[in-house]
Amino acid sequence: MPVPTGARPSTRTRVWILVLALLLLGGGATAYTLRAASGRDAATGAADPGFTLDAGAGALYVRDTASGRVARVNPSASGGRVVGGPSCDRFHAAGGTALCLQRRPGVPARSYALVLDRSLREVRRIGLPGIPSRARVSASGNMLSWTMFATGDSYARSSFSTRTSILDLRTGYLVKNMEQIPLTLGGRRHHAPDVNYWGVSFAADDNRFYATVSTAGRTHLVEGDMRSWSARALRENVECPSLSPDGTRIAFKKRVSDGPREPWRLYVYELGTGREHAVAERRGIDDQALWTDRETLAYGYGGEVWSVPADGTGAPRRLAGGASSPAVPHPG
């Protein structure tokens, strides 16, 4: 007999409908969860499996501009680039440790310092104020430092503020802002509200370090001591110091012009003699140079990574196009 119009399904039918609905909803939820997790992984920009810091002596790592991820390049081979590292705005690595500074979009935008192991897996994450500017890891991989712009985005502007931090991985102790370090300037203790530090470079003992301090409109090279937590100014007109592997020389940015167009040149300062010389790179360099070995510097310019002999001879050589933040985790 035909079922009358408007008749309700049987109890068994209703049970099967409910089971089917739950299965469909469960499958959809599972798919949504998987897609969301995949989206989070893509957003964090984790390293691909097998992409590590163990590529051998002299291997060059950079931030690939097109992808925003860390890449390994072979300057001697045309097109020799492997992109597989995390997404970073600034990157540095040494001694089996990497430091990745990230700027995440949002309202408000957020910045992070990611501490990575030799497999480029995240081991610590620190929220940061401002815009990533400089990143450095000591040769041992134990000491890390980063600088953030709190306001402004260029040293060429008349006013800016920085926040420079130091992290000791051996103890986990974090100096959130080194502006409170006791500073000796001109033989006297210096106190001023306009003190800003940036561009830390560590010595081999993981205690001594060099950095730039700005105060009263002038920049100074300072030598710092972690154990005594003190710093003293050595000389003026030094920015973004980078200590050589043998600890005898410092590559730095020297201001050679007050104009906004290419105000800096790359110089090398001998700590023992106090002598300095310009390198063969004559363009204006706004970067913290990297010693790839005892005699060579690498740096970013014009969206590319270049190198030049540190002794003032030779000529600049392009290492990688569409790249920045050079790092050599295992110098040759």
Go through each PLM region and give its residues.
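Beta-strand C-termini and the immediately following turn/loop, strongest in propeller blades
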Residues: 60-66, 97-107, 146-153, 198-216, ...
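Short loop/turn segments that connect beta-strands within beta-propeller blades
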Residues: 74-78, 117-121, 169-171, 224-229, ...
